[in-house]
From Swiss-Prot:
The gene is RPS13. The keyword Transport does not apply. Its main location: mitochondrion. InterPro entries: Rbsml_uS13_C, Ribosomal_uS13, Ribosomal_uS13-like_H2TH, Ribosomal_uS13_CS. Gene3D superfamilies: 1.10.8.50, 30s ribosomal protein s13, domain 2. One of its GO terms (biological process) is translation. This is Small ribosomal subunit protein uS13m. Part of the small ribosomal subunit. GO terms for molecular function: rRNA binding; structural constituent of ribosome. One of its GO terms (cellular component) is mitochondrion. The keyword Ribosomal protein applies. It comes from Nicotiana tabacum (Common tobacco). Belongs to the universal ribosomal protein uS13 family. PANTHER family: 30S RIBOSOMAL PROTEIN S13/40S RIBOSOMAL PROTEIN S18, SMALL RIBOSOMAL SUBUNIT PROTEIN US13M.
Length: 116
């Protein structure tokens, strides 16, 4: 088991599959990172050397917005919506659905969890 950018990667998975578990890295970016570093597509996480792992961490940290940066950006966007008191900001505060979903019979559990 290995941790890269706060994501737990299982050793038995291939690098191309396991790297998509990192927040902010999708299939396309996983292929780009692997191609730039010259890592085979069939190699598994547990077969990587320490040097290759360090290279992957360094490349992901430099070129891509990942994990905490992504979460911070999302939180800042929500805070901005709340501060300007727009419809979506108010719905975020209430814990209600934002995009016009039905609330009479659905979304009850979501509202209960937030109001406790």
């Amino acid at each position: 088991m290995l941790y890269i950018s706060g994501a737990r990667l299982v050793g038995d998975e291939q690098v191309r599959i396991a790297s998509t578990k990192i927040d902010g890295i999708g299939p396309k970016k996983a292929i780009q990172v692997r191609y730039r570093l010259g890592i085979s597509g069939n190699i598994k996480i547990k077969e990587l050397t320490k040097y290759q792992i360090d290279q992957i961490e360094q490349m992901i940290g430099q070129d891509h917005v990942v994990h905490w940066e992504l979460k911070r950006g999302e939180r800042a966007d929500i805070e901005r919506l709340i501060s300007i008191s727009c419809y979506r900001g108010i719905r975020h505060q209430d814990g209600s659905p934002l995009r016009g979903q039905r609330t009479h019979t659905n979304a009850r559990t979501c509202r209960k969890l937030i109001r406790k």
